[in-house]
Structures are given as structure tokens and as C-alpha cells.
Amino acid sequence: GGGLELALGCHLRIAADTAKVGQPELGLGLIPGFGGSQRLLRLAGRAATLELCLLGAPVTAERALQLGIVNRVVPAAELEAETLKVATQLAASAPLALRATLDVVNIGGECGIEEGLQYETAQFGLMFATDDMREGTRAFMERRKPTFTGR
């Protein structure tokens, strides 16, 4: 339902092992709104999307992982800690490279492989002009964690 649709709008999804997700809207006289059918289709494929949307039965977190709806399943007691760990890792990333990675993946999913490769190559080249690339390389050589500035 709405919770799944909200999660489908996220770049990464971590589920507790006790979670269940579904699209029960048909039973309410509705259709999945807010991108529910379209995002689910792109993540899980046509057959799984039709099953979830037409039958309305929720699936377990483990099944959602198999379908590609979630990225990870962790014990419920560890959900917050795992989520904070992932968020901390992302926050420590080079902001320009993080944004470019998201752009490359998103654009690549909407175009042909040749166009996607050209865009990726262009973005890769742009990263060489950043202070963050120099800091990341320096930190790697010095065996320390980088301090990125977003420049």
C-alpha cells in the first residue's frame, strides 16, 4: 500500500525480517497510486507486479528481497542500527560522485546502452576535475579515510 509506495521512491530499501509489503488497493476499489505500479514494475518485473497488485496479498520481507523490492533484510531488532550504518556510509561519500552515480544509474535505466555508456563516460571524466577525487586518491594512498568537501 502507501508504505510500500513510499519505500519504492527511495534509492535503497532495508526491511525488517518481520515486515510484509503489498499493494492491497484493488480490494479497496482503487489502484496503486503515487508510483506504486510503475516503480514496482521496474524493480520486480511484470509478473511480480501483477501478482502483488491484482491479488493484493502481502509478501514477506524475504520474498520482497528475492523480487528485488528491498535491498536487504535484517533482524527487526537490528533495523535501526543497519539503517543508520548505511546512512552514515552514504553521508561520508563524496557528494558529487554520489549524485553523479545516482544520475548515471537513473539515466542509464531510461535509455539505450550506448547512450548510457556515453553519459557514464562523461560523468566519470567530470569527476577527475573535483577536489573530492584528489582527496579520495590521496586518502587511499595514505591509508586513511577521506574527508570530502563536495568540490
Give a label for each model feature.
Residues 25, 107-110:
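A short acidic, helix-capping loop that chelates divalent metal ions and anchors anionic groups
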